[in-house]
Amino acid sequence: LSFYTFSYAEGLSYFSDDPNSCMNCHVMRDQFESWNHSSHKAVATCNDCHTPHHNVVAKYTVKAINGFNHSLHFTLGTFPDPIRIKAMNERVALENCRTCHVDTVSQMHASPGGEQADCVACHGNEGHRTIE
């Protein structure tokens, strides 16, 4: 069953940086299309925002966890609608926002509690805007 699922879901494509691999699963079509029409398309692929940059082990660990979860939900038909980002993936994306936009982030002041601003609180749909 695992081999069939991996093969059917084109599992090897998830090891690439090709955004089209996100289209293997029909539930990601809206996210792909909104990225495809966003300003981020010119500067970032799915992996640039959704996988860690600091080391290759962390990158492929996140890809493996997400690949397993996606293939499981795809096979069982249990994806939530609309699909929601998990806490681990939101932390990865936020860190990548801060890495790519370091000049902007460095000019921001921490909150009185010492926490850095949460980019996705205001820009949560960035890269995945609703297409009208």
Question: For the regions a protein language model found, what residue spans apply to each?
Answer:
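Short sequence/structural segments immediately N-terminal
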Residues: 1-132
